[in-house]
Every structure is written in C-alpha cells, then in structure tokens.
Design a protein with these regions (language model features):
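Active-site beta-loop-alpha junctions enriched in small/polar residues
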Residues: 8-12, 35-37, 66-70, 90, ...
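Glycine-enriched alpha-helix->loop->beta-strand junction motifs that scaffold or abut catalytic
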Residues: 25-29, 56-59, 78-85, 101-110, ...
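Conserved, mostly hydrophobic/aromatic
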Residues: 22, 32-33, 77, 132, ...
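N-terminal active-site wall of soluble small-molecule enzyme domains
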Residues: 31-101
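Glycine-rich phosphate-binding active-site loops on the catalytic face of alpha/beta enzymes
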Residues: 85-93, 133-143, 187-206
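Catalytic cores of alpha/beta
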Residues: 16-22, 69-79, 117-128, 174-190
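Hydrophobic faces of well-ordered beta-strands that scaffold small-molecule active sites
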Residues: 3-8, 30-32, 61-65, 83-87, ...
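Glycine/Thr-rich beta-alpha phosphate-binding loop at enzyme active sites
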Residues: 36-44, 48, 115, 125-159, ...
Length: 215
C-alpha cells in the first residue's frame, strides 16, 4: 500500500491560499484538529470553519476530534468531504456508538492513543476501526517536539496488527519532520504540519516525507 501524507492544521484558521497550494500537490488528506476546550484546554475550529475549509480544498478531510462528546459532531461532519474521524478513548461518549454512527455515513473511524497511554487499551477495538493515530506529542498544543518513545510504540503496534492479521492503518501525529520520519517506517500515514506548510515547496516536502516511510 502506498504510504500517505496528511497536512496538519491545529485549530488555526487556514488561509485559502494555503489550501489552494495544497490542491496542486499529491498530499492525501487535510488533517484538521478540533478541540472543545474540555478534552484539552484549547478550544478551536467551529463547524462553520470546517465548512469553509471544504470550500477551498479538493482533498479529503482527516478529522481529529479532541472533544469529550464526538457523537454530536458526526452528523454534521458527514455532510463534508470527510475520509476519517478519529476520537480518543478517555471521553464521555460510548466508543462503539461512535463507530456505528460513522459506519452509518460511510466514514472511516480512528482511535488516538496519547503518549502516556499503553497500547493494550486499544486491543478491544483494533478489529473494529480503520486506523490508530499514535500521538507523538501531547494533544492540544502546537510546536512540541517529537517524543522518541513513539517509535517503539508504533513498532509494537505493527507487530500486534500482524499477529492479529489486521489491516488497520497506523498514523503518527506530532512533531514529524525529515529527521525522525525515517524511523517511522512502520507507519502508514504521516501527519505533518510545519514541515510542509512552512516549506518553500509544499510538493517537495510531501515527496521527501513519503520517501522516508516507503520501502
């Protein structure tokens, strides 16, 4: 399977010109973080802003819900060009209900695991979801450095998926750059913000990141 790249935006209003520039690249997704001010302290990205993003981009959205009650978001998100909705486990809504609701709309489902969480909390859901999002920084704040222990977590998760004969994808989000991406060969999707957006050539950055995890 071709390794994928998701260009990330953490709650800031995304300039139309940036989205337009990404349209002419082969980036796979626009990764959007949504925060409710409860799961994490920061509050961002109302639904109206997400709607605006889809007006300017042809890319599918990869939505990361850092919220306590994801269920109330799903119906609205289903009206947009959303590929996958990722939620966290330590929330108020029932995970199985979230999975069922996403399936109803034909939307893929992901579960995020934070740096301080052990992999085994994911095990009951691995055969029910499409993706695991390994957080390589603590959720909610931009500009953090990549946490090196995330590499071992990704490698261990890959072994667990092989053992179970599952095709669940592994995505990694947080502080991903050209230096650490080469150690993320067991990831299927790299989520990267500033490495792409702050580069002079978006396509060049995307190509380099993809090569880092392609065998």
């Amino acid at each position: 399977m071709k390794k994928k790249i998701s260009a990330s935006f953490l709650g800031a209003k995304i300039p139309a010109k940036v989205l337009t520039k990404l349209n002419v690249t082969d980036v796979d997704f626009i990764h959007v973080d949504v925060m409710d001010g409860k799961y994490v302290k920061k509050k961002t990205m109302p639904f109206s802003e997400l709607s605006t993003i889809t007006y300017y981009t042809e890319k599918r959205l990869d939505v990361h819900l850092m919220v306590m009650k994801p269920l109330k978001w799903i119906d609205n998100l289903a009206t947009l060009n959303v590929d996958c909705i990722t939620v966290h486990l330590n929330i108020k809504d029932n995970i199985d209900k979230i999975i069922d609701r996403c399936r109803l709309f034909g939307i893929k489902v992901g579960i995020a695991i934070n740096p301080d969480q052990e992999l085994d909390i994911l095990y009951p859901y691995l055969d029910k979801i499409d993706k695991v999002l390994v957080m390589s920084v603590n959720p909610g704040l931009p500009g953090q450095e990549f946490i090196p222990s995330s590499i071992e977590k990704i490698n261990n998760l890959r072994e667990e998926l092989k053992k179970r004969n599952l095709k669940t994808l592994i995505s990694v989000d947080g502080g991903v750059n050209f230096l650490n991406a080469k150690d993320l060969i067991n990831a299927d999707i790299l989520v990267s913000g500033s490495t792409i957006i702050k580069s002079d050539d978006f396509q060049d950055a995307i190509t380099k990141l993809r090569k880092c995890i392609s065998k």
